[in-house]
Amino acid sequence: VAGKRMQMAAIEQFMESIGEQDHQTQFNDLSVRLDTLDVTVLRVLATVANGESPGNESSILKIMATELAQDITELGMVVRQYAGIASFSAEMPDRAGAKAMVDYLGTRSQSIYGGSNEIQKNIIAKRALGL
């Protein structure tokens, strides 16, 4: 969650630096989803600390975290494209654009490793819903 918060802070800083407001609603939505993920992680940790099994929550967390990571990195790319700034542009000497591209491409695989999101959804359907 901490890494996702750092990505969100970088996106927010970039959006402010270019005066970008068109994607503010999407940014706010991601912020709420990140807070929700944080609370869910804490709830699961409390369950484990009490000696209980997390059950379906581990599958739910995997889906929430990977989809959120993908959406955060996608927003990072969208606002950079919106500003017309290329990955290795002189406007971004710290290579933040290149890092955004690496993060974006890297998160695509997160929905596969650890069990694809589709498999995780099937696990939840079978265990929680009895389907």
Spans of model-derived segments:
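Alpha-helical interface subdomain recognition
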Residues: V1-L131
